[in-house]
Design a protein with these regions (language model features):
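Alpha/beta-hydrolase fold catalytic core
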Residues: 1-47, 71-73, 112-113, 299-303
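Active-site loop/oxyanion-hole signature of alpha/beta-hydrolase fold enzymes
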Residues: 40-42, 77-118
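Flexible "cap/lid" loop of the alpha/beta hydrolase fold
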Residues: 132, 142-173
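Conserved HGGG/HGGXW glycine-rich cap/lid loop of the alpha/beta-hydrolase fold
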Residues: 42-85
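Acidic catalytic loop of the alpha/beta-hydrolase fold
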Residues: 224, 250-254
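Conserved alpha/beta-hydrolase catalytic His-Asp/Glu region
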Residues: 18, 153-158, 176-238
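Catalytic active-site module of serine/aspartate enzymes centered on a nucleophile-bearing elbow/loop
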Residues: 268-303
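Short beta-strand/loop motif that positions the catalytic acidic residue
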Residues: 239, 245-247
């Protein structure tokens, strides 16, 4: 047993070293409460905040979405707390409201007021939490293949194990990263299906996301997600701001009928943007659709 743990620990150290060597931080850092967040801050004009999904990072928006938006807007793409190059929160229990609070503090520290907030996948959960908990701090909202409603999900054993005191630390620092690296290609293909994985896919968020501390943060996020959504979904009718809901009809990760279509029908005045034949990873495969949706939300928020 000790030999297996040592082998896993060495393998983990090699994967972490390679990921950090190949994918250093390319943005700046901002202090928000107890955390230091990594942010890609580009352009000028009406502000847009981009919130990435699970096992992702700010680089998921870069360069296509960020560059297109930065031509006319100030764009802030954060690594969420505990993800990418950002610090984890002291209390890592997966509550999206805590991430929402820290992101608001971060953009305020950068002099931004009432941005349009766009969230992809799990990032939409956080974006909705921002809009519900701090309505006056958001100009408009965009969800992109969002995790929005409870779907009756059951916890993954690996994520549960990562949360166990002491034993979870051993798991995340020995075998979690190697095992995640082996299943990552299958997960990536599913995220792009029914389309192929494009050559432009930036693998840096995945490589960084399976490092021990990042794996633990992702595990906490995903483990807490379905119970949290059972509470948050009761409040969606409270949303009283411009909302654009972007959905890929072929998404295998966040089922369109459960998540995006349901939200669009619940919120008066919501605009639904449907993308036939596309999969979950719209920021990569249909960046122009994502950019257009965000820009329309910005304009609606300024009226």
């Amino acid at each position: 047993m000790l030999g297996l743990l040592l082998f896993g620990g060495v393998w983990t150290a090699m994967l972490v070293h390679d990921a950090e060597r190949r994918y250093p931080a390319t943005g700046s850092f901002v202090r928000a409460g107890e955390a230091r967040l990594h942010v890609l801050d580009r352009g000028s004009g009406p502000a847009i905040v981009l919130v990435h999904g699970a096992f992702g990072g700010a680089a998921d928006w870069d360069p296509t979405v960020i560059d297109a938006l930065a031509a006319r807007h100030r764009v802030l793409a954060f690594d969420r707390p505990g993800h990418g190059h950002s610090d984890a929160l002291e209390r890592c229990d997966g509550d999206p409201r805590e991430q929402a609070r820290v992101l608001i503090e971060a953009w305020r520290a950068l002099g931004v007021q009432r941005p349009t907030v766009a969230g992809f996948s799990y990032g939409a959960t956080v974006a909705l939490a921002i809009a519900l908990e701090a309505r006056d701090d958001v100009g408009a909202l965009v969800t992109i293949n969002g995790a929005i409603h409870s779907w009756g999900g059951t916890p993954e054993p690996a994520y549960d194990l990562a949360a166990v005191p002491a034993l979870g630390w051993v798991f995340t620092h020995t075998w979690a990263t190697p095992l995640a690296s082996l299943v990552a290609p299958t997960s990536v293909r599913r995220a792009f299906a029914p389309l192929d994985v494009p050559s432009t896919f930036d693998r840096s968020p995945v490589a960084l996301a399976i490092r021990p501390r990042n794996f633990a943060a992702n595990a906490a996020d995903i483990d807490a997600l379905d119970p949290f959504l059972r509470e948050q979904e009761r409040r969606y009718r409270e949303l009283a701001l411009p909302l654009v809901v972007v959905v890929a009809e072929g998404d295998l990760v966040t089922t369109p009928s459960i998540h995006s279509h349901a939200l669009a029908s619940e919120v008066p005045g919501a605009e639904l943007v449907s993308v036939p034949g596309a999969g979950h990873q719209l920021p990569y495969t249909h960046a122009s659709v994502v950019v257009d949706a965000i820009e329309r939300a910005v304009e609606r928020g300024r009226r």
